[in-house]
């Protein structure tokens, strides 16, 4: 647990294959091979659904709290990586190399963060408004 500015809490665990702190610091971006493997898995899931009559498949990824509210992260740890984050790198890979409809919602949700709080201050999850705005985007895209 990291206590940020204005007492915002950030949970930065390390668990199998994941390291939220390294994600925030941009030190563990996916390799080209890892991106290709993940993209292939998503395409297989899409194909499974399409083979069963689903007419539309769109894969969404919501950003984490550290991404949207980095202004509340404490002075340390600093971002030390150069360039894009892990998910930004993967989103670019998907756009350039995959025919799966894919959307990383960072830019879309960021425009709401100046006016609204989309994540809980003392929790890692989106609040109801963040969930609603995300859901509305999905419904809008699917209709």
Regions found by a protein language model. Give the residues of each.
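Extracellular glycan-modifying ectodomains
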Residues: 1-143
């Amino acid at each position: 647990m990291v206590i940020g500015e204005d007492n915002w809490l950030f949970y930065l665990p390390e668990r199998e294959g994941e390291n939220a702190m390294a994600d925030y610091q941009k030190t563990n971006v996916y390799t080209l091979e890892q991106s290709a493997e993940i993209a292939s898995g998503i395409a297989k899931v899409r194909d499974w659904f399409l083979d069963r009559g689903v007419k539309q498949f769109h894969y969404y990824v919501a950003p984490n709290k550290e991404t949207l509210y980095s202004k509340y992260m404490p002075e340390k740890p600093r971002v030390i990586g150069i360039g894009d984050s892990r998910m930004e790198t993967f989103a670019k890979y998907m756009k350039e190399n995959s025919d799966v409809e894919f959307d990383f919602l960072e830019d879309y949700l960021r425009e709401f963060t100046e006016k609204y709080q989309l994540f809980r201050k003392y929790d890692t999850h989106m609040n109801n408004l963040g969930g609603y705005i995300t859901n509305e985007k999905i419904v809008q895209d699917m209709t």
